[in-house]
Amino acid sequence: MHRLVVLSSLLALTFALPQRIRNGNGRNGGGRAQQATAQQQAAQVPQGISTAQDGSTILDDTVMHLHSRESKPKLTPKSNLPIRFKISAPADQFLPASGVPGAAATSAKGTLGANILLHGDGGQSFFDMPNQNVQANTMGVALLAPNANLFWGGGSGLQRTDGVAHAQAVNDFVQNELPARVAVNTSNIVFTGVSGGSLLMSGFFIPAQMQNFANSAVELNCGALAPQVAFQNAATVMPQTRIHYQSTQSDLTELQASIPQAVAAYEQAAVDAGMSAAQINALQTVDNTPAGGHCEFDGQDFVSGVQTMLSSYASVMQGGNGTVQGIGAPSTGVVTKGVVGNEKLKFAAGGRKREAEVENMVNMKWARQAEVFETGDVQLLSCDRTSC
């Protein structure tokens, strides 16, 4: 049994979350002080209605995902998941029940598709919302991980211990809650993963939930895992699912191993589904040409790099010529190289982390911009910048 219950405000989310206790006066200070989790800090960033770069309206709200495998719901902490979301679409495409001024849709069935974005660890791309502009008749949607550290799939690194529950929550939101707020073409749902969000998409969502989204597409930016759960209806999913893997020359060391493993695994799934090499290359593509670090697709920065990929999403994922405007050298701009024959990606030196520097390497620019807390005080490891 799966259902979603609306939270009316941030108060319920903030009140329900535990406080993290840390020593005061620095890491080894003598006093005791409460250090809020990343999720609690995110709850302090106001929700509501704002305007997107292209003039669309952004609705920022939270729902509670209740998940039970039994006929009589018996909630556990892992099944009671707050899903904060952003929907960016023209105001008149929202349903009046959304509370958006100017909402004029009279039916949940619309003409706009939706690009569902899952951010990397720490939530940076949720707050940036690089998919906020309508592109190729597709609205933007971003979901915030229901995890204290804002890690999609929970856990850390390549071990996503809550991947099954989080993938289910994403599916249920798209199937049930999105059409309750905005008119959407449910036959045109595509997905984007960023770093840790890509790990959830490739490791759990595609094999477990993609059977519910016919003729879909998934862009896996700076991260990928081979399927971590049984692949449901792979013979149907693989011939109708577009997958693109985008990395950089100096991506994180662990991702330099896991991305090629994912490429090989999904290619094999396509072979097992009876697809030819030409058919596979038409749907599955990969590139790691840009010289840059983790998610620095423009060769400059994490935030601008992710924006670079999302600004050219339609070109890469929705029938375009595969050109990414502004991608970093030495790329020619075209990133859609078929996976067959390109499984063994060649990388430069990867981004390595030293244990003593883990906390200071975290990058959560949204928090600094909101003047909520300083990066150096965050007690988590961020896939958005230093690890996956």
Where are these regions (language model features)?
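Active-site glycine-rich loops that stabilize anionic/oxyanionic intermediates
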Residues: L112, H119-G123
